[in-house]
UniProtKB/Swiss-Prot annotation:
The lineage of its organism: Eukaryota, Metazoa, Chordata, Craniata, Vertebrata. This is NEDD8 ultimate buster 1. Residues 539-561 have a biased composition (Low complexity). Residues 549-597 are annotated as: NEDD8-binding 2. It holds the Pfam family UBA. One of its GO terms (cellular component) is cytosol. Its main location: nucleus.
Length: 614
């Protein structure tokens, strides 16, 4: 298949260079049948490519037929408005490399298109996902709204792995339906779990009792990132980790939607993309996923993604990895990423008909593989010392295969990370204490968090921020119990403020604004010379009684408990796939890469062998 793709790409190049239009005479007759001139063309190009004339003729005929189909489709679209979509099916449903075309109007919804694809090609509608232009098709929006155009490519991802005789075996069909439902639920739980963890990252939680995710730099220390970008980055990295977990299990059809979601969220924090290598790794993972799904043809910008990854690595690691070496002391582990990059660049060039470029990249990948290959006995020696296989591989690559140096490196890194985690945990604990201190003074959790963020964690400065910005005190918590407001403050509270020297009317207004909180009202009035600041004076007019709990509220207890259980399940499922080792993305046995490098090098070698023989 790969060799045929190469020939197709080369012949397409030749046809463009020679400005040959196969859909016109003398290559196509009036009745659209093949003309005799195609044979002459096949002979000319087969000599140029040093390969079988008959094979070249067959591929030229395929290209000619596709060109005619495209021209017919274009004319049909101009006259009727009915668009043609090229559907790329899973490998088990492809028939002799024949194109699968579907006609539709572009005002229909994504759900309509999914239904049409399911009916046409024999899928169960709820168990497929459609990817167009590297985005999942949204069911509720029209195709036009989602940028779907005439002649677009649509890839079908099947959430169940059907057998050819699935319809003959009812028991097997039922099992596979259950499997598909399970996979769909997993995808939905992934989304919810990541949203919960991203929200917790913005909350002040006790790290001892509530799991949360954090974003760290290459040394393992937390990064200060603006809240809006932080949430987008958290979701991007979370989806990426989940996608990588599916990649490890070779569940490429489920991995791809996660990776594409990660790409979408990364694009919401573009200023950070050049400073972290995560985005570059994601581009590699997306191209790798398309390749393993045998759908590289659907990824029109594979070359662009790989170039983007290369540029991002250079920005993050520096010229010749100088910045990386300065931070980490070595770059041995990161070479795994460059091996994957060169391999994919080799594959992409081969599929594009660029044999020499493919050979160059594949040879670079092979050279890196030789450098990164690890003697199993050395891994065994480190296992005997109590290290994990992952630590052993990473340590040996960081230390050029020296076992003693690797053992020291791993031990030092363990100690360094333990210290960093201890410091980060203490920092989180102090922040929690500071928030609770401000809450004890009457401020909302949200106001306390924002003030501490502005004051870079300093409690005294945060208090000054709050006193200088009373409008912040109305930042509300999610918990309505923390947002109580009083229509009529108690006389006792009013008397307390009057006793402190404040005017009765002003005291009552302040208590209305601050929900009866005497301490907040007193602090505000004292800070502003005995009166409410203008931006808070209207609040007292709008105060309304806190709604009392109705009997129906208690009826939701069971439902809330169920929702909480589901959220816990979703979070736990995410946490299971978040690797404990911060350099997990750099760890690979390189077994798959070794096989694929050899396979594609054999393809490019066969090209040069044919050239020499001729």
């Amino acid at each position: 298949m790969a060799q045929k793709k190469y020939l197709q790409a080369k012949l397409t190049q030749f046809l463009r260079e020679d400005r040959i239009q196969l859909w016109k005479p003398p290559y196509t007759k009036e009745n659209k049948e093949v003309g005799l001139a195609v044979k002459d063309l096949a002979k000319k190009y087969s000599e140029r490519l040093e390969c079988c004339e008959n094979e070249v003729e067959n591929i030229i005929e395929e290209i000619r037929r596709k060109a005619i189909e495209r021209g017919t489709g274009n004319e049909h679209y101009r006259t009727t408005g009915i668009a043609t979509i090229e559907v790329f099916l899973p490998p088990r449903l492809r028939k002799h490399d024949k194109k699968s075309l579907l006609e539709t109007r572009l005002h229909v919804t994504g759900r309509d298109l999914r239904c049409q694809i399911a009916e046409t090609f024999g899928f169960q509608e709820n168990y497929i996902k459609i990817v167009i232009n590297k985005k999942q098709l949204q069911l509720g929006k029209s195709l036009e709204e989602q940028g779907v155009t005439h002649n677009v490519k649509a890839m079908v991802l099947e959430l169940k792995q059907s057998e050819e005789d699935v319809r003959k075996n009812l028991q097997l069909e039922e099992e596979e339906q259950n499997e598909a439902e399970l996979k769909e639920r997993r995808i939905q739980r992934t989304k919810r779990g990541l949203e919960i963890l991203a929200e917790r990252a913005e909350m002040v939680v006790d790290p001892e009792t509530m799991p949360y995710l954090d974003i760290a730099n290459q040394t393992g220390r937390s990064l200060r990132i603006p809240p809006a970008e932080r949430k987008a980055l958290m979701l991007a990295m979370g989806y990426h980790e989940k996608g990588r977990a599916f990649l490890k299990r070779k569940e490429y059809g489920i991995a791809l939607p996660c990776l594409l979601d990660a790409d979408r969220y990364f694009c919401e924090c573009k200023e950070l993309l050049d400073t972290v290598d995560n985005y570059a790794v994601l581009q590699l993972d997306i191209v790798w996923c398309y390749f393993r799904l045998e759908q590289l043809e659907c990824l029109d910008d594979a070359e662009k993604k790989l170039n983007l990854a290369q540029k991002c690595f250079k920005n993050c690691y520096g010229e010749n990895h100088q910045r990386l070496v300065h931070i980490k002391g070595n770059c041995g582990k990161e070479k795994v990423l460059f091996l994957r990059l060169y391999l994919l660049q080799g594959i992409q060039n081969y599929h594009s008909g660029n044999g020499e470029e493919a050979r160059e990249y594949l040879n670079k990948a092979r050279q890196l593989f030789k450098e990164l290959y690890i003697d199993p006995s050395k891994v065994h020696n480190l296992l005997q010392l109590g290290f994990t296989a992952q630590e052993a591989r990473l340590g040996l690559r960081a230390c050029d295969g020296n076992v003693d140096h690797a053992a020291t490196h791993i031990s030092n890194r363990r100690e360094e990370l333990a210290q960093i985690r201890k410091e980060e945990k203490e920092k989180r604990r102090r922040r929690l204490e500071n928030v609770n201190t401000l809450r004890g003074m009457g401020y909302s959790t949200q106001a306390a968090k924002q003030a501490l963020h502005q004051a870079r964690g300093n409690l005294d400065d945060a208090l000054k921020v709050l006193l200088s910005n009373p409008h912040m005190w109305w930042l509300q918590d999610a918990d309505p119990e923390n947002n109580s407001r009083q229509a009529s403050p108690s006389q006792e509270s009013i008397n307390q403020l009057v006793y402190m020297g404040f005017d009765t009317v002003v005291a009552e207004a302040a208590l209305r604004v601050f929900g009866g909180n005497v301490q907040l009202a007193a602090q505000t009035l004292a800070h502003h010379g005995g009166s409410l600041p203008p931006d808070l004076q209207f609040s007292g007019e709008d105060s309304s009684p806190t709604p009392s709990t109705s009997p129906s509220d208690s009826a939701g207890t069971s439902s809330a408990s169920t929702d909480e259980d589901m959220e816990t399940e979703a979070v736990n499922e995410i946490l299971e796939d978040i690797p404990e080792h911060e350099e997990d993305y750099l760890d690979s046995t390189l077994e798959d890469e070794e096989v694929i490098i050899a396979e594609y090098l054999s393809y490019v070698e066969s090209i040069s062998s044919a050239a020499k023989n001729n």
